[in-house]
Amino acid sequence: MSFAPHSVRKRQAVFKKIGAVILDVQNISLSFGGVKALQDISFNVKEHEIRAIIGPNGAGKSSMLNCINGVYQPQQGSITFRGQTFKHMNSHQVAVMGVARTFQNLALFKGMSVLDNIMSGRNLKIKSNLLLQALRIGPAEKEEIMHREAVEKIIDFLEIQAYRKTPVGQLPYGLQKRVDLGRALAMEPQVLLLDEPMAGMNVEEKQDMCRFILDVNDEFGTTVVLIEHDMGVVMDISDRVVVLDYGKKIGDGTPEEVRNNKDVISAYLGTSV
């Protein structure tokens, strides 16, 4: 099933300009005891593209994202972001560099409002110390106003204005996913890692999320790395796709190339899509 509106896909194909390599993954291997989660994985991501990572359950997709954003430390290989190569970086350091992440399992502050949850994504941008923030005086007050304005724009962009003061735990699952995306966008990332952003959604919710992802990529110029099980979504909105199976890379190319790759069809798709 195709979720991305035809006019959006056509606009993306005609006007979108893919840049140079912004993220380069080379020979990444990751093991947990005797279990090889990733085996010699290499691929790159270019500026302004939507890069999908697909594969069956247990293929190593989330492990790959965890290596990119510093949650896991691979035993072998390296990751280069904007020309800076790192092997052992923690999540905070990676976030400071300009990489944001959403997770398959939501980790929102359920008792806090939509506004405050998204505001928490601005923490890396805040320069005032905690005392000045609490007192809201001088530069700290001006800074908070600036950050709140940025968050309000994200709330408008995600069309959740009516819920801005609502505790996140009271929202339907699909709207909580939008808040999770909004918190990541609040970091103003250069690369956005999305781990199954449409999992558990109905068709209408998927349509909305597809539109938001395309607009983030198109209007903000944010590079997107996406894990998604819905092949209709992947084929519609991705520029390139890398395919993993049992921790190994078995395919890499455009959606059309992956669609017709015999190894991919055999291991994951079952039939041509």
What are these regions (language model features)?
Residues S2-V273:
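Glycine-rich phosphate-binding loops of nucleotide-dependent enzymes
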